[in-house]
Structure formats: C-alpha cells, structure tokens
C-alpha cells in the first residue's frame, strides 16, 4: 500500500449528504472477482448526468473528494473504497462517515478525514469559485489547505499510523514474518496444518 504523508491534488466539491455505498458503487458491479479496475463503476448512476461534478472537465482529474454529512453509510462493501481509489482519489473530506466505510478506507490507503461542516462549506465555495483548485491534505499535521484557508481534520491515531507507514493487513502481517516462521518451526508436528495448494495442471 502506498504511504500517505502529504497529498496535493484537485479538489472535487460534492454537495450531497447521506451518500451510501450503493450510490458510490451500484451492486451490479460487485459481481467482479478482482480487487482493481472499478473506476468506471464509481458513482455510475450519477455519471449518466452530464451535469454531475465528475463530468466537468476541471474536476475530472480530482483526487480529493469533498463531500457532505454521512458519506459512505449503508452496506459494508470494500468495493466502495476500491472504486474511489481506482478512480484516483487519495482522500475524502466529510463532516461524518459511515463507521464501516471509514474502517475499510484506512485499510485500503484512502484517507477518510473528518472536517467540520462549517469548514466543508468554505472549501466547497472555494472549489466551485475556481474549478481545478488543488487541495493539500497533510496527514502528519492533520490539516487541509485550500489557497490561504487552512482547517484541521480528525483521523484515528491508529489509522493515521497505518496510512503513514503504508500498511494494509498483509503488510502488517509481514512485519511479523520472522516470528511466524519461528512459531511454525517450534509448533508440534501432531497439530493440524494446512495443505499447500497443488500446482495447477
């Protein structure tokens, strides 16, 4: 997983509240068996509207999504995070997130930063006044900056550490590879084991 310390990218103002995971990625796209390639599925229902924000040229290369209250609510689907990540988003700013979405985001390298609604309103205005404006998200200092405006954001300490270190669940496990190898070497042979996969024909 790519490390995250400071990111600067085009901000995308999404003036919508209660955006659930089915709106982020419709269920029809969940049939895929891969973990990547979901960029076309992101907000698929809304992207049929020519006026949707991601259909506006200045916002298309966006990597910082600025959303309304209760982003990522609804069913638990990691695909919602994958779709945002595959499109190119590194951070989502919102006053509040769905708990499961927020947890999934941190494990997949996407920062879900909690920003006060009053600050979100000011960021929306700045991005709409000058489409294509870049937003700086500083995870080390926990601040977001747009032009001369700076606002703090909240993120769980553990999630912040994982993002800064670039550690997904596999990366965390591999940090203990030596201990795992040592344990397996000392483990009694009469205990159950898993059978290695047979080579494919």
From Swiss-Prot:
<keyword id="KW-0456">Lyase</keyword>
<comment type="pathway">
    <text>Amino-acid biosynthesis; L-leucine biosynthesis; L-leucine from 3-methyl-2-oxobutanoate: step 2/4.</text>
</comment>
<dbReference type="InterPro" id="IPR033940">
    <property type="entry name" value="IPMI_Swivel"/>
</dbReference>
<comment type="function">
    <text>Catalyzes the isomerization between 2-isopropylmalate and 3-isopropylmalate, via the formation of 2-isopropylmaleate.</text>
</comment>
<comment type="similarity">
    <text>Belongs to the LeuD family. LeuD type 1 subfamily.</text>
</comment>
<dbReference type="GO" id="GO:0009098">
    <property type="term" value="P:L-leucine biosynthetic process"/>
</dbReference>
<dbReference type="InterPro" id="IPR004431">
    <property type="entry name" value="3-IsopropMal_deHydase_ssu"/>
</dbReference>
<dbReference type="GO" id="GO:0003861">
    <property type="term" value="F:3-isopropylmalate dehydratase activity"/>
</dbReference>
<dbReference type="InterPro" id="IPR000573">
    <property type="entry name" value="AconitaseA/IPMdHydase_ssu_swvl"/>
</dbReference>
<protein>
    <recommendedName>
        <fullName>3-isopropylmalate dehydratase small subunit</fullName>
        <ecNumber>4.2.1.33</ecNumber>
    </recommendedName>
</protein>
<comment type="subunit">
    <text>Heterodimer of LeuC and LeuD.</text>
</comment>
<keyword id="KW-0432">Leucine biosynthesis</keyword>
<dbReference type="Pfam" id="PF00694">
    <property type="entry name" value="Aconitase_C"/>
</dbReference>
<dbReference type="InterPro" id="IPR050075">
    <property type="entry name" value="LeuD"/>
</dbReference>
<keyword id="KW-0028">Amino-acid biosynthesis</keyword>
<dbReference type="GO" id="GO:0009316">
    <property type="term" value="C:3-isopropylmalate dehydratase complex"/>
</dbReference>
<keyword id="KW-0100">Branched-chain amino acid biosynthesis</keyword>
<dbReference type="InterPro" id="IPR015928">
    <property type="entry name" value="Aconitase/3IPM_dehydase_swvl"/>
</dbReference>
């Amino acid at each position: 997983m790519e490390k995250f310390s400071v990111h600067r990218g085009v901000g995308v103002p999404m003036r919508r509240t209660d955006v659930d995971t089915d709106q982020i990625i419709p269920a029809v796209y969940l049939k895929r068996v891969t973990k990547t390639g979901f960029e076309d599925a992101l907000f698929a229902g809304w992207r049929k509207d020519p006026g949707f924000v991601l259909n506006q040229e200045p916002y298309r290369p966006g990597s910082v999504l600025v959303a309304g209250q209760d982003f990522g609510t609804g069913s638990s689907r990691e695909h919602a995070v994958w779709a945002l990540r595959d499109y190119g988003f590194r951070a989502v700013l919102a006053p509040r997130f769905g708990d499961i979405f927020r947890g999934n985001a941190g494990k997949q390298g996407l920062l879900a930063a909690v920003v006060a609604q009053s600050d979100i309103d000011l960021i929306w205005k700045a991005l709409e006044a000058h489409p294509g404006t870049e937003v700086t998200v500083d995870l080390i200092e926990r601040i977001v900056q747009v032009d001369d405006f700076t606002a703090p954001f909240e993120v769980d300490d553990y999630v912040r550490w994982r993002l800064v270190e670039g550690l997904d669940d596999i990366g965390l496990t591999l940090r203990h590879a030596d201990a795992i190898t040592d344990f397996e070497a000392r483990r009694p042979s009469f205990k159950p084991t898993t059978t290695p996969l047979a080579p494919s024909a």
